[in-house]
């Protein structure tokens, strides 16, 4: 998200599909996207009880065929109420910028970008640092436009989480960056 760098490169995670260069297949964020109503639901225990569950849900909520609405209600259960999404991207002139969004802004932009498009994102590698109730994850993902199609892009998302004694919460999707020919992913993010 959006939210891996892919989704999130797409958005995303994630993470509103942001790509450094437009290949003609990328999905760009919508500046004036319509507001998406997000119903309040209870979190799924399997999503929030482990770091693996959190990451699995993080990518699943943005993935699906073109005719399937994204799971924004499930997505909202993963985050603290005031979570921020900070997306790193490079414009066509090569200038790198950071864009900060609320969850609602992320959803509005992502939903508009993903509507009517098949998008599948999943984790391929993770670096985890944990100290007590705090965890920092660097999650590498790849995305495709079909569940069995060729990889179209990869990205790295930086997720900060905390354990409240009963469940994990994502407090910040601090950065994600999408791989490009100018910025290939380093080996440590792939194996």
Give the role of each language-model region.
Residues 2-21:
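Sec-dependent N-terminal signal peptides
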Residues 22-33, 136, 154-184:
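Short beta-strand edge/turn micro-motifs at domain boundaries
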Residues 22-78, 189-191:
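Short, low-complexity N-terminal intrinsically disordered segments enriched in polar/charged residues
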Residues 58, 75, 83, 137, ...:
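Hydrophobic pocket/interface hotspot
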Residues 62, 79, 87, 141-143, ...:
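Short beta-strand segments enriched in hydrophobic/aromatic residues
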Residues 72-84, 88-95:
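Acidic helix-start/capping segments at beta-turn-to-alpha-helix junctions
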Residues 78-80, 132, 156:
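Extracytoplasmic
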Residues 84-85, 93-150:
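Surface-exposed, charged secondary-structure patches
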